Amino acid sequence: MKISLSLQQDFQSPELELKRAQLKKIIETTLRHVGYKEDCEIGIACVDLEESHQLNLQYREKDKPTNALSFPSDIPEEVLPMLDALPLGDLVICIPVVLQEALEQKKTAQNHFAHLLVHGVLHLLGYDHETSDEDAEEMEGLEIEILAKLNIANPYQE
């Protein structure tokens, strides 16, 4: 499986260094865990509070910034055979929110970002925690298993 990663860092912080190789490892671990084997493309945009707030309001009608948003690709079925790699979609991650949540939850910023990346990739693959309690439990279970493979503790444990 080949992963093409587009990384746009509109907001950066010395507290959270993002390395392309590490991001690809997290994405690949997530994809392999759920049995995904195709070449794919994923975009990640790291944004500030203002942009996160604007996007969250525009797409989710929530008037506040959020940690992460996922935008699954909407490629027509008939186009897929013409593509070398399947565009899975884009993730927008708000670095200031990630840093604040990590502090509040007593986690490292790297581990919290990794969790949100796993969570977002699962959304791009069609997993959804807002449709039912069962779906939420399935998604959380997958996140815990994937993060364990990356030597990251269960993010839902107090």
Curated annotation (Swiss-Prot):
Gene3D superfamilies per record: Metalloproteases ('zincins'), catalytic domain
Localization: Cytoplasm
Record flagged with keyword Nuclease: yes
Cofactor(s) essential for the protein: Zn(2+)
Cellular component aspect of the GO annotation: cytoplasm
GO molecular function term, any single one: RNA endonuclease activity
Keyword rRNA processing in record: yes
Transmembrane segments: none
SUPFAM superfamilies with a match to the protein in the record: Metalloproteases ('zincins'), catalytic domain
Cofactor binding mode and count: Binds 1 zinc ion.
InterPro entries: MetalPrtase_cat_dom_sf_prd (IPR023091), YbeY (IPR002036), YbeY_CS (IPR020549)
EC number(s) recorded for this UniProt protein: 3.1.-.-
Biological process (GO), any one: rRNA processing
Key words, A-Z: Cytoplasm, Endonuclease, Hydrolase, Metal-binding, Nuclease, Ribosome biogenesis, rRNA processing, Zinc
Ligand binding (Zn(2+)): H119, H123, H129
Purpose of the protein: Single strand-specific metallo-endoribonuclease involved in late-stage 70S ribosome quality control and in maturation of the 3' terminus of the 16S rRNA.
Entries under PANTHER family matching the protein: ENDORIBONUCLEASE YBEY, CHLOROPLASTIC
Family statement: Belongs to the endoribonuclease YbeY family.
Protein name: Endoribonuclease YbeY
Protein species of origin: Acinetobacter baumannii (strain SDF)
Taxonomy of the source species: Bacteria, Pseudomonadati, Pseudomonadota, Gammaproteobacteria, Moraxellales
